[in-house]
Amino acid sequence: KKAYDGHYAIGAFNVNNMEIIQGIMAAAKEKQSPVILQASEGARNYAGQEYIVGLIKIALQDYPEIPTALHLDHGSSFEICKACIDGGFTSVMYDGSKHSFEENVRITKEVVAYAHDKGVVVEAELGRLAGVEDLVSVDAKDAIFTDPDQAAEFVELTGCDSLAIAIGTSHGAYKYSGEPYLDYERLEKVGQLLPDYPIVLHGASTVIPEFVEKCNQFGGKVLGAKGVPEEMLRKAARMAVCKINIDTDIRLAMTAAIRESIFKNPENFDPRGYLKPAREAVRQMVRHKIEAVVGSANTI
């Protein structure tokens, strides 16, 4: 509500390990910003749900002044959402966008009923983003922009607390083959039909050229990567978008720093030697996103 009224968004950053969490929280403290730490099913498979929740609980103890949510990103079933709700997540996303409208409504309602009974909020998705990221993969030909009228009906039928819509972003590092595009008219229409309601943008990494170039400079092959320009995301945040998801930029920032460190220090075999600059790269990148993209600096 505060973000909607203030015409800014809150950054939702995907986490997989300790260094990412530490970097994000340090940046949030510096910029005095709320933050959403989100774990995908892939992160749960990689680190284990108990480890992810445990690390974030420690972060909450270290940064009690920072409003922080622990969110499930792209939960693919009621069972996954239930496990996360029971395991300590404060927010979950059920992604039923691959299903028919009716089936998406049915399962989302089940998740909402269970979550709300436990004091947990629910994000849902209507429309399909193209791209590949983690366990989510959608061909461009199967991408579907969100219908504003259906969005309003969906929220009314399900009672979900926020809605991820498709207006031109996509998952992964290769978002556009042509010029970047966001359908602001569609977003505005959704906002008119759902006043004072938080909209979510997935696939919103900028794919920062500095990190792409550094990855390639030090042995990587990240070729043809293109993201969403920052000014386009900022405009969306001034409209109805209250949550902006960022994953790929974290991956690129960390990988660029690790590649550079290993290249410049070939004698080092201590993981801390390259994970420390990776953590610092995350901190700097998140600081920039908070201030220049989502606009949530100094809102606590």
Language model region names:
Residues 1-11:
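N-terminal amphipathic alpha-helix/helix-capping segment at the start of soluble metabolic enzymes
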Residues 200-203:
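Generic long, charged, amphipathic alpha-helical segments
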Residues 1-2, 17-43, 50-65, 74-198, ...:
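Alpha/beta enzyme core
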Residues 206:
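Alpha-helical and His/Cys-centered functional microenvironments
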Residues 217, 222, 228-300:
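C-terminal alpha-helical cap/extension of soluble enzyme domains
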